[in-house]
């Protein structure tokens, strides 16, 4: 049995997906951010066979400013949901860049892992990470339905509220 990890599956070059994901993004009035360069000793994406692994994308607003803070203290569940949604937009931007700006190469999203910077008594991590899951499935439809983990942590890089990888 092959071990699946957080990843997005990409299509063989010869097979094209009939769904126009760029059109869907436009219909949803979404704007993809610029795919960010890594801030450490790692790569933003790695392709292995037909699998695309995307490093953690941190919460940033429309202006590229970090969404910093702790759920259960500075932010509520709805704020976290929106921060996770922003992380997912960055995941899609990274996937698009890795696929030569051709999202039709995406076959499916296999798994997301979301990390929520939260207080000890905050327990809505799954609701927060729904922001990322809902965005991915709204763009990719059934191909965007994925396995998932939503993890609480007491700190995230640069003090951000949410981080999601694929």
Predicted features and spans:
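Short, Lys/Arg-enriched N-terminal segments with co-localized hydrophobic residues
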Residues: 3-18
């Amino acid at each position: 049995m092959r071990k699946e990890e957080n990843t997005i599956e990409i299509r063989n070059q010869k097979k094209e997906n009939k769904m126009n994901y760029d059109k869907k993004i436009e219909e949803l009035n979404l704007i993809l951010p610029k795919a960010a360069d890594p801030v450490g000793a790692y790569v933003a994406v790695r392709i292995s066979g037909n699998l695309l692994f995307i490093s953690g994308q941190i919460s940033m607003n429309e202006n590229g400013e970090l969404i910093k803070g702790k759920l259960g203290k500075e932010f509520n569940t709805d704020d976290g949901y929106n921060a996770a949604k922003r992380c997912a937009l960055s995941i899609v931007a990274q996937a698009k860049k890795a696929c030569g700006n051709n999202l039709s190469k995406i076959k499916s999203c296999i798994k997301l892992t979301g990390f929520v910077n939260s207080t000890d008594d905050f327990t809505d991590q799954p609701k927060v990470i729904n922001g990322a899951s809902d965005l991915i499935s709204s763009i990719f439809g059934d191909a965007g339905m994925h396995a998932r983990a939503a993890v609480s942590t007491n700190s995230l890089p640069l003090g951000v509220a949410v981080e999601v990888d694929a």
